[in-house]
Design a protein with these regions (language model features):
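HEAT-repeat alpha-solenoid elements in large eukaryotic scaffold proteins
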Residues: 20-34, 63-90, 98-101, 108-124, ...
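Fungal intrinsically disordered, low-complexity polar regions
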Residues: 1-62, 259
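Alpha-helix boundary/capping and short turn/kink residues
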Residues: 113, 131-135, 154, 190, ...
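Core helices of alpha-solenoid repeat scaffolds
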Residues: 32, 44-58, 89-104, 123, ...
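Conserved tryptophan-centered aromatic signature that marks the ligand-binding surface of SH3
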Residues: 235-241
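Hydrophobic residues within the alpha-helices of tandem HEAT/HEAT-like
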Residues: 77-82, 104, 118-130, 141-149, ...
């Protein structure tokens, strides 16, 4: 059932920004700025019913017949995550989202800009609201989203960038996240390398009070290699972005920064 609720700003968490063209900015802003009325549920069964009704829409490839139901499903999920389900029925809600994850990623990778954007915004919202609750989805999410960042469509790449940033900022840090950033720093496409500097800065700021989590297991060496690699990147934008990340690194580990 639907009940009105105060508007909550879920889009203020980016620790860095990359300039976009006006089309990309306006397309994303149109969806970010809309008011989404939350769905409030009264039982686990309601969540089950919502998820079960969506599953058929995500089967197979995107077609002229299923893209609109997929878009409506994303609208429903964005309403659901803003309601009481993530708090009152957390475990059941997250199990339901996990069962829909393949379909959600199909939406994220859609060539239809508004559909893909809706998928990315949902992932940003669930990362900010559920945080560590989506830890078991992070590997699959980062694999897909970093690949999205390498695509030719600038709007989709920018959405992927913002979504990766939101995930890194809100989930539990594990060394595998740093591995993904290292791979992005070496990507043959310039956009993941450009974005990786911002993602790394977000990660460093997040873990600044828990430095040992990065220091253990060789993580600090990986960070240094990422910084050195991008500071020597042939693309000036990548070099410039990583300079800001270096100064963040230098504040946290001044002895290593001076080397």
């Amino acid at each position: 059932m639907l009940r009105p609720a105060p508007k909550v700003d879920l889009h203020s968490g980016l620790s860095h920004s990359i300039s976009t063209d006006s089309l990309a900015a306006s397309a994303t802003a149109a969806l970010e700025g809309e008011y989404i009325e939350p769905i409030f549920v009264d039982s686990n069964r309601e969540i089950d019913d919502i998820v079960r009704n969506m599953l058929p829409h995500f089967e197979g490839r995107e077609t002229e017949h299923n893209w609109i139901p997929r878009e409506k499903s994303m609208e429903t999920l964005r309403k659901l995550v803003r309601g009481n389900a993530p708090q009152a029925y957390s475990q059941h809600f997250l199990v339901g989202i996990k069962s829909l994850l393949d379909g959600i990623l199909k939406v994220v990778n859609s060539l239809r800009t508004t559909l893909s954007t809706a998928g990315c915004l949902f992932l940003q919202e669930i990362a900010k609201i559920c945080g560590p609750g989506i830890d078991n989805m992070v590997e699959m999410l980062l694999q897909n989203l970093i690949k999205l960042c390498a695509g030719m469509k600038k709007i989709s790449a920018q959405n992927g960038n913002a979504t990766v940033d939101a995930i890194i900022q809100n989930v539990t840090y594990v060394p595998r996240i740093l591995q993904h950033l290292s791979f992005a720093c070496q990507d043959k496409n310039v956009q993941p390398r450009l974005f990786a500097a911002g993602w790394l800065k977000t990660l460093l700021n997040k873990q600044a009070r828990h430095k040992s989590s990065i220091e253990h297991g060789g993580g600090l060496d990986i960070v240094e290699k990422c910084i050195k690699r991008c500071l020597g990147d042939p693309n000036p934008g990548v070099r410039e972005s990583m300079r800001g990340t270096f100064w963040t690194f230098n504040q946290i580990w001044p002895d290593r920064g001076e080397e």
